Amino acid sequence: MDRIHITGGTPLNGTIPISGAKNAALPLMIASLLTGETLELINVPRLADIAALTRILGNHGVDHMVVGKRPGQTAETGQTVRLTASNVIDTTAPYELVSTMRASFWVIAPLLARFGEAKVSLPGGCAIGTRPVDLLLMALEKLGAEIEIDGGYVVAKTKNGLRGTEIDFPKVTVGGTHVALMAAALAYGTTVLDNAAREPEVVDLAECLIKMGARIEGAGTSRIVVEGVARLGGTRHEVLPDRIETGTYAMAVAMTGGDVSLVNTRTDLLASALETLASTGTEVTALPDGIRVRRNGGGISPADVTTDPFPGFPTDLQAQFMALMTLAKGQSRIRETIFENRFMHVQELARLGARIRLDGDLAVVEGVERLKGAPVMATDLRASVSLVIGALAAEGETQINRVYHLDRGFEALEAKLARCGAQIERVRA
């Protein structure tokens, strides 16, 4: 099993190109099942989760072709893919494939909407709480699907097609909004989604669906209206920049000191996180094609955050921000309101010398003068990258084990950091 070795203490300086967003690319790829025509996606990151979904789509009969990379990207980053679902051979998504990645469960929506049936295994993925699929299934049932659970599979059918309806989500759900958008796009009549997720990735999916011929209004607000159409066609669409990768590298610069330009990204994708980062004493400046992050001298000021749905502070940056706060000059309070059991990185940060106390959904971080390198173990995707950030600022060498988590969500991480001066190396098993 691969490991990453990091010798900390080197400020980061240079330029980091931001990849396409995994959390946008996944639903976009799944949307290829809605049409028999070709969907071409630009700026798709090269990640383990993308490869896993490609295998799942291939199992259904979707043809996949890599045709190039985004201009300015290196050989290990970014790709343009063409997906064609003209010969779907199977509407079953088996356990051995779906269990590798939770988002793959979303194939249930386009399969049901286009073919009237789907049999999809209950999902796997990051071990950060239950992440129930109840809200996704509720949305499909509201649209007229008949659903039963049989042997660990969700079996969904519709006799006469899906029907437009009103869906009021009891809590904000990104997955539920993705599923409802895809299903409603081919439903008869009008569907209204209330308390819909406002995340940029939802907007990106909606914009792609509109290019495919869907009639959608209100994406990016809490009320989305979808007028169903009889069929969707192919299109060409560029995946939006990864706001979580952007925030991750911004926090790494803040923690190590230095001056880095993050290019191919946008400030509006993570305004709340950047505002919080600026409050810690880090200089954050908008560039024409990205963001400049600088912290040269001076301590890290403590800051309190509460994770919230967009446009609030992202839960996917909580672990990284906690790593930054371990070196703040004072106490910080971090409250996690989105997912349960998302503090698994705490005990590993403690191995580096962090002082963190947990109280339910609250983490109280007492800043220390320095961290020291140690062997640590990644437990999930975001936790693993928080350990990378901590290790970059720690004295001595840190060995991070189980780094396959990183490969699920961060494209060419070692190469991007090394180009900015980080002493980082992957040791392959």
UniProtKB/Swiss-Prot annotation:
Main localization category: cytoplasm
Stated family: Belongs to the EPSP synthase family. MurA subfamily.
Function: Cell wall formation. Adds enolpyruvyl to UDP-N-acetylglucosamine.
An annotated GO cellular component: cytoplasm
PANTHER family: UDP-N-ACETYLGLUCOSAMINE 1-CARBOXYVINYLTRANSFERASE
Protein name per Swiss-Prot or TrEMBL: UDP-N-acetylglucosamine 1-carboxyvinyltransferase
Protein EC: 2.5.1.7
Pathway: Cell wall biogenesis; peptidoglycan biosynthesis
Species per Swiss-Prot/TrEMBL record: Methylorubrum extorquens (strain CM4 / NCIMB 13688) (Methylobacterium extorquens)
Gene Ontology MF, one: UDP-N-acetylglucosamine 1-carboxyvinyltransferase activity
Source taxon at top rank: Bacteria
List of residues binding phosphoenolpyruvate: K22, N23
A Gene Ontology BP annotation from the UniProt entry: cell wall organization
